[in-house]
A protein has these predicted regions:
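Cytochrome P450
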Residues: 1-192
Length: 192
């Protein structure tokens, strides 16, 4: 980033800091939240956990459906680049908009039974990783990290207990995940 330039101009310090913060947040926070949301889901849905334990080839499908069903990012802010009317409402150039990916991921016009988690859902498209020029540049790494984590976790989860009463959700409406989620593992029951 220090050497990057466009039309002979280098990035400013504030742009470098902003991009660095984005890379850190997007590359860590979101994958962590995807995995923690998936752990909570699997502990609350032992039938899905059993399916994954019996057929690990379903883990990539599980990751995609988790991204759609309870993704780590609820939405992001965007700035309108021009005046536009949308469904009878005026949006002015410069207005700040909050795009709710999570709402789009539950669109009944796009998904059959959108509020139901479906491990075998045929339409695997979702907005959790953005679209177009705003598509997550770390999406392949995030998917791989989640896949590897769940390949290991499906054997550990039957021996885990979460302490929801002492857990704490992320208090920021943009993100979906946990700040704190205490757990215990019955290590004596684990196969080494």
């Amino acid at each position: 980033m220090l050497d990057a330039s466009e039309e002979g101009e280098n990035l400013r310090t504030d742009e470098i800091l902003g991009l660095s913060k984005l890379l850190w947040l997007a590359g860590n926070e979101t994958t962590t939240n995807l995995i923690s949301n998936g752990v909570v889901f699997l502990l609350n849905h032992p039938d899905v956990l059993a399916d994954l334990r019996n057929d690990r080839t379903l883990i990539p499908d599980f990751v995609e459906e988790m991204l759609r069903y309870d993704g780590p990012v609820m939405g992001l802010f965007r700035t309108a680049t021009r005046n536009v009317e949308f469904r009878g409402k005026n949006i002015n150039k410069g207005d700040t908009l909050w795009l709710l990916f999570s709402s789009g991921n539950l669109d009944a016009d796009t998904y059959e039974a959108p509020e139901t988690f479906d491990l075998h859902r045929r339409n695997k498209d979702h907005l959790a990783l953005g679209k177009g020029i705003h598509f997550c540049m770390g999406s392949a790494l995030a998917r791989l990290e989640a896949k590897v984590a769940f390949e290991w976790l499906v054997d550990l989860l039957p021996h885990m207990k979460l302490d929801f009463e002492n857990g704490k959700r992320i208090p920021v409406p943009i993100l979906s995940g946990w700040v704190k989620l205490p757990m215990s593992v019955d290590v004596g029951a684990l196969e080494v």
